[in-house]
Structure formats: C-alpha cells, structure tokens
Amino acid sequence: MAKPTFKRQCYIKRHLRPLYRKHSRCSSINLGHGNYSLYINRVLKEVVPNRGISSYSVDIMNILINDIFERIATEACQQMFLRKRCTLTPGDIQQAVHLLLPKKLATLAVTFGSKAVHRFIHS
C-alpha cells in the first residue's frame, strides 16, 4: 500500500493578508469570554451622557458580566441534566436566572431578555 503524500505549502508572511496574521490578537476570543467594554460605554453614555468611566472600572465590569454569564450557563446545564434532556431550552436559562438573582432583579432580567430575543427573532 502506498503512503499518502501531503503537499506542504510554505507561505511567506508578507504575502498573507493581515487578517490571517492576527490570530492571537485578543486572548479573550480564545478563552471564550466576551469583551463588553464597548457596550458598557454605550450604556453609560445613554444613562449619564456627560460622565466617563476609567479603563480599570470597565475591566471590573467586564469580569462581573463574564462571571454572571458563566454562573447562569453552569446552573442552566445542571437544570438540563436534572431533567435528563440533551437540549438547553429558554426555560432552563430562565430558571437558572431565578435561582441565581434576587427576586425583582430576576423577573426584570427574564422580562427584558425575553423581549430582546423576541425582537431578534422577528426583526
């Protein structure tokens, strides 16, 4: 039986497009964590137009948002496994939010989240 031969292609870096050279530009993409600094600034400008926020505060808010999302995802997966299902449903996520957040904040989060999903689907 003959050995399969693979062509090795050598590319010179200057001939590659800049998009392909910048693979490890942002380490948060590789870790699966989002960077919400742009959205934090947009919400701040919408709520208080003439105020700013330091980059250190934005980093703290970013860590807080990533932590909350991770906790919600973990709790929703536990709910999914408790019900012995393989599909994560919006009900699992809503129940995880109700378990993790205080009562009033959880109802507001579920309400606004449902509205946002509805607008996204029907736009």
Swiss-Prot record:
Q: In which tissues is it expressed?
A: Present in testis (at protein level). Not detected in other tissues tested.
Grouped into one coarse class, the protein's main location is cytoplasm
Molecular function GO terms recorded: DNA binding; protein heterodimerization activity; structural constituent of chromatin
Record's CDD domains? HFD_H2B
- List each coiled-coil range: none
Q: Which UniProt keywords apply?
A: Cytoplasm
Location(s), subcellular = Cytoplasm
Q: From what superkingdom does this record's organism come?
A: Eukaryota
| Keyword Cytoplasm assigned | yes
Report the GO terms under cellular component. cytoplasm; nucleoplasm; nucleosome; nucleus
Q: Which InterPro entries match?
A: Histone-fold, Histone_H2A/H2B/H3, Histone_H2B
Family stated for the protein in its record: Belongs to the histone H2B family.
- Which purpose does this protein serve, as stated in its record? May act as an acrosome-nuclear docking protein in sperm.
- The name under which this protein is listed is Histone H2B variant L1
